[in-house]
Amino acid sequence: MTDLPGRRLLLVHAHPDDESINNGVTMARYAAEGAHVTLVTCTLGERGEVIPPALAHLSGAALGGHRRGELADAMRALGVDDFRLLGGPGRYADSGMLGLSDNDDPGCLWQADVDAAAALLVDVIREVRPQVLVTYDPNGGYGHPDHIQAHRIAMRAAELAAEAGCPVAKVYWNRVPRSRVEDAFARLRDDLPGLPFEKAAGVEDVPGVVDDERITTEIRGEGTAYAAAKAAAMRAHATQITVAEPYFVLSNDLAQPILTTEYYELVRGERGGEGRENDLFAGIAGTFDTGEATS
């Protein structure tokens, strides 16, 4: 790839929809600012539960193909042109929830050799030369096998890429500060009677919640076009998500807030100043900051 923009962001996710829920504001912001945003999705989510009755017939490869189309629609909403499947379509299958027999499928991501899968991601890193990599924490946010493997693959790829002379300057994990999500759920409980959802999720249902002091970086989107783009991207994943702003449900039908500020923990690289960063590229030589770190 030639003529790369000055800022290059790589995100690694397990299934279509994970990127929009976790990073929709972030992706929309950096795409709009002219950064090169690359999304690598590890599986097509063929074993996901389908919400709309009209699409309930979809399963397996048919569901995977449909979700690939949803992903393309979501990327259009976010303004992202570079989105790929790890190893190409069908290379790795959805593993299903932990403890199911699906985990034993030799073609699923859970059974993948991490070094072999990471080598495929290194090829992407060598091509796009990202300064920033975003993925999950070691538990994958909430313990799904594909999320755990996506974390392992991304972190191993960062190591291998550095050994190959293509280091990634900063690596972040998706996080949510406990105080923020507690406040959001308090508002949700007040709003629930007026919503098309019967029950609310709890703080324990939100992936990646940590104590506030673990948060190093926040990307704000309240009241911006980036927040609107995130909601539109989430709506595009209609088999998996029902949106009633500022809330949504997954197939468990438990309402939770759409987070229009997205939070991160820097786990590799140098922090860009004191206090919380508000730019993933803060402090990286050869890029420009769009804001100062805040307390």
Curated annotation (Swiss-Prot):
Name the UniProt record assigns to this protein: 1D-myo-inositol 2-acetamido-2-deoxy-alpha-D-glucopyranoside deacetylase
Binding sites annotated in the UniProt record for Zn(2+): 15, 18, 147
Family membership: Belongs to the MshB deacetylase family.
Co-factor(s): Zn(2+)
UniProt keyword terms in alphabetical order: Hydrolase, Metal-binding, Zinc
Record-linked HAMAP family: MshB
UniProt feature coiled coil, ranges: none
Biological processes, Gene Ontology terms: mycothiol biosynthetic process
Top-level lineage group: Bacteria
Reactions catalysed: 1D-myo-inositol 2-acetamido-2-deoxy-alpha-D-glucopyranoside + H2O = 1D-myo-inositol 2-amino-2-deoxy-alpha-D-glucopyranoside + acetate
One Pfam family cited in the UniProt record for this chain: PIG-L
EC number: 3.5.1.103
Biological function: Catalyzes the deacetylation of 1D-myo-inositol 2-acetamido-2-deoxy-alpha-D-glucopyranoside (GlcNAc-Ins) in the mycothiol biosynthesis pathway.
InterPro entries: GlcNAc_PI_deacetylase-related, LmbE-like_dom_sf, Mycothiol_biosynthesis_MshB
Species this chain originates from: Streptomyces coelicolor (strain ATCC BAA-471 / A3(2) / M145)
EC main group: hydrolase
Induction of its expression: Gradually induced by thiol-oxidant diamide, under (probably indirect) control of SigR.
Any GO molecular function: hydrolase activity, acting on carbon-nitrogen (but not peptide) bonds, in linear amides
